[in-house]
Amino acid sequence: MGIVINLFLIIFASVVFFAAGFFLGRFFLERLGTTKVLEAEERAVQIVQEAQKEANEYKELKVTEVNQEWKKKRREFDQEVVIKNNKFNQLQKQVQQREAQLKKQLQDVRDTERKLQDQQKELDQAMETVGIRATELERIITEQNQRLESISNLQADEARQMLVDNMITKAREEATETIHKIHEEAEENAGRLAEKTLLTAIQRISFEQATENALSVVHIQSDELKGRIIGREGRNIKAFENATGVDIIVDDTPEVVILSCFDPLRREHAKLTLKKLLADGVIHPVAIEKAYLDAGKEMADVIMSAGEEALASLQIPDMPAEIVRLIGTMKFHSVYGQNLLQHSREVAMLAGIMATELKLDPRLAKRAGLLHDIGLVLPDTDQPHALAASEFLRKFKESAVVLNAIAAHHGEAEKESPIAELVDAANVISLARPGARGAVTADGNVKRLESLEEIAKGFPGVLKTYALQAGREIRVIVEGDNVSDSQADVLAHDIAHKIESEAQYPGQIKVSIVRERRSVAYAK
């Protein structure tokens, strides 16, 4: 019995200890799991906080960069606004000054017109007086005939003829003097009117003159792009030059790449190609060839737009597409360092204004002025550009007045209309005025004047020669004993002809012969 009780106690104790161990183990396991969960949650919170901190720092960095970029753009914009405002104020001031000048010139022209009308009235009165005097002369002749018949044995016909001859001689002398005086007054008034017309035309237009060079500048976003433009071992530069025929210069100048070529059209094509490559961001030989082809299509649009813009600015309608394309091509050519299209527009505006002042058709004048140098962009022609342009435009049924003005503006054809004279004068003004011919240096001008004097010195009987008015007049002093008045006229013609054949000059040169003969005697 005692054994059974002990066995029971042992079993009971085992069960109790087992249960206690089970519950204690479960308690410790649950406690350990709760601790790990708390640690994981704390770690997660820490990670989130660190990520939030990094995000805030990154956000602050980007906000700072954006603010700096905005401030930079704002400064650039403010500077540009200031520059444009200054330029606008200058242009406004120039316009006001020119308006005042034009008002004064308009008043001068009106005064001149009134003077011409007064002179016309005086001339009409003079003609009326001449008619009255002629009637009086006939009456006097009749009376003299009657007197001669009564006091002389001469026949009436003989006496009448004698009187008529005397009176005709005297009348011719008086008429010659009157005509000479009227002619001088007309020349003087015409000179004043021509001067005012030219001044009005020149002052009513304004073109910025800039000498054309052989460089184009392309701005890039950063200097890092220069390495991509060069390519590995310079292969991209070689491919670009082979495709475009334009030299590309990559130097230390920040954010700038330079294109160099003597042909402005080719250089502009290359500039568009490079801009397309920079916009796409892909630069390699195949991409360069594709960009060059795409830029070629865009160049055709650029050329047509330039031609249409020139026609619109001059209000010239009805121009065939082929001619519009050639006009646009002139934008990418130069003459004496001056942009060819700008020069042609200037000639057109000058000719149009002068035609308006002289009551001629300004549309024909502007049309001829714009097209006068189109022969310089015609391909494969051996003719002088003026004649080549005239023949080319004849195919498009251009008016005869315009064709003659174009063909004659360099003296290779006879001028058949006043429009031709105006286009020639406008061309000379545009090329000869200061700032237009940037290629003509001071040293070149000195040599030109010296050559003109040497040409005149080579003729017999010449003592001295002087080039005056910047070469627009050559004054020649000759020996009075060896050169007569008639010989002086021939000498002036010969010198002018030799200058035309041997010298190059803008406009016309006046040759003046000065002949002086001195006779000396002494009273004793």
Curated annotation (Swiss-Prot):
It is a single-pass membrane protein. GO terms for molecular function: RNA binding; RNA endonuclease activity. Its main location: membrane. It is found in: Cell membrane. It is an enzyme of class 3 (hydrolase). GO terms for biological process: mRNA catabolic process. Residues 340-432 form the HD domain. The chain crosses the membrane at residues 3-23. The keyword Transmembrane helix applies. Residues 214-274 form the KH domain. GO terms for cellular component: plasma membrane. Its EC number is 3.1.-.-. Keywords: Cell membrane, Endonuclease, Hydrolase, Membrane, Nuclease, RNA-binding, Transmembrane, Transmembrane helix. Endoribonuclease that initiates mRNA decay. Belongs to the RNase Y family. This is Ribonuclease Y.
